[in-house]
Amino acid sequence: MKKILILAFSLFTLGTYAQREVPQSRMEQIYEEAKTPYKYGLAVAPADNKHKIDCPTVFREGDKWYMTYVVYNGKSGLDGRGYETWIAESDNLLEWRTLGRVLSYRDGFWDCNQRGGFPALPDMEWGGSYALQTYKGKHWMTYLGGEGTGYESVNKPLYIGLAWTDRPLGSAHEWQAQDKPVMSIHDKDAQWWEKLTQYKSVVYWDKEKTLGAPFVMFYNAAGRHPETDLKAERVGIALSKDMKKWKRYPGNPVFAHEADGTITGDAHIQKMGDVYVMFYFSAFEPSRKYKAFNTFAASYDLVHWTDWKGADLIIPSKDYDELFAHKSYVVKHNGVVYHFYCAVNDAEQRGIAIATSKPMGRSQVHFPEREVKNRRMVMELDKGWKTWLCDKSAYGQADNAPTVVDIPHNWDDYYGYRQLTHGNLHGTAMYEKIFTLDNSLFPISNSSFGKRYFLRFEGVGTYR
């Protein structure tokens, strides 16, 4: 009898282990299903260079689509107060109208300066309703919060807060929130991988209780590995039966890339058949030439994840996302996949962009004009030059009367009976342009102003 029991247990163990890896063929199917090669452009962009927009969450209520996103009110990582959470609506997932705030700064609380929210309990089904489910008659939202000013945790650690509302989602109104965080790096059961700070969190309603509780929170946090001392951002899980009291999963972190400074974060999970798909972003990955990108992993049990080794889903490739193209929220509707992501350009302008599985046109939303930050300024000087011939030529007489031209310019028309390779007209011509440099474009603190100017001429006297 003992031998039979041991054999049965061994078979069960092997079967469980085999389930942990999602086969490559299935991963390729997921990639083909989710890829979005057509970049539509920006969906939401700041109106000025004193704000940055980040972290989209998209859901449906009735016949409208809604997007929450966070807004940072600073030009750099140090000069702003912090995050607030806003909401926008759309009829078609492409064109968005801003409605207003849902989580604002609140003085005198633990989260006075940071309130970046992420709506909870979304429908996890790929191509499903994308509605937010209610629990106890309320909609819920977890958020990264803190008292430190600046961009995210630049000055002080962030913790995880909880907010809710019983009002319609389609109106911009302030959500209620608890007076203290539900998760903190100072909790007695806080784990090594989250000891520095906590970041984005999303709560899913797993009614099958795969991990023993109905509410599963995926969150990313920063910490140092106790053995290697590698500092990185990793993804872990917390569980709850009532949305308010949370217990950390003992096997955390459940997903990470162990390279110093690497970020693995912002898990967005949907279920494709029997497989859970985690859309996530990675940054400063040594194997990539670009700095930040979106890709995916897959799992049968929410804990053991198989990383996709093929082409990334979203990478920097446009002038609006050339620095970072990261932080996924993916929706499939009416046969089209919409991949919302945070786009950051080299001027550090930050907004929400969309890529799609089918061509959907081009967005009319753009970042504001970039500010001149550097000591180097580029001016176009190709218009309005005066020019005149200075001497006799082989096939023409000098004419001292100037004429106004744009450069590149050539006096020769290449006509004439000889049709020489270098033209028929030979001699000397003068070109003159007077321009004024606007000193106001240079900051007063720029001590190099007035010392050096470089003019590069192209196309005067050239031929093709």
Over which residues does each language-model region extend?
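Extended carbohydrate-recognition surfaces in non-catalytic/accessory domains of CAZymes
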Residues: 368-458
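Positively charged n-region of N-terminal signal peptides that target proteins for export
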Residues: 1-4
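Residue-level marker for the onset of beta-strands and adjacent loop->beta junctions
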Residues: 54, 84, 199, 265, ...
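Hydrophobic h-region of N-terminal signal peptides that target proteins for export
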Residues: 9-17
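Short, surface-exposed beta-strand/strand-loop-strand elements in extracellular ectodomains
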Residues: 462-464
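Non-cytosolic beta-sheet module surface loops
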Residues: 343-345, 456-459
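Beta-rich carbohydrate-recognition and catalytic domains
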Residues: 19-117, 121-199, 204-262, 270-323, ...
